[in-house]
Amino acid sequence: MLNEVLENTERFMSSVPKTKRKKYGQFFTNETTAKFMASLFCFDLSKQKIEILDAGAGTGILAAAVIQKLYELGYVGKIYVTCYETDELVMPLLEENMALCNKLHNVSYTLSSTYKCNFLGADNKQ
């Protein structure tokens, strides 16, 4: 799953000029960094649900790495992901990548393109 998300992101990056990506600060997480960051999370695998907040989701690479890590660890509960991203150009790919996570691992997700709410107060009850 993570590999497909990375491939989708690479396609996106090659379709958008670097100068435009630079203007928006678009430098997406690479595979090594995403896997390393996912390894830093401490998960309680006995929980029936785990909620993930990705406050600068980009194309969903980090969220996908965390989801993949959970399944590699044998997690069998429900995963909820809340993604925030301000770049409207990236949103369709973020949607595509989160839909892939849903298809492969039944992950529920919410996407938002605004930062008008308090992340700590964001509520994703499903």
Identify what each model region corresponds to.
Residues M1-Q126:
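SAM-dependent methyltransferase catalytic region
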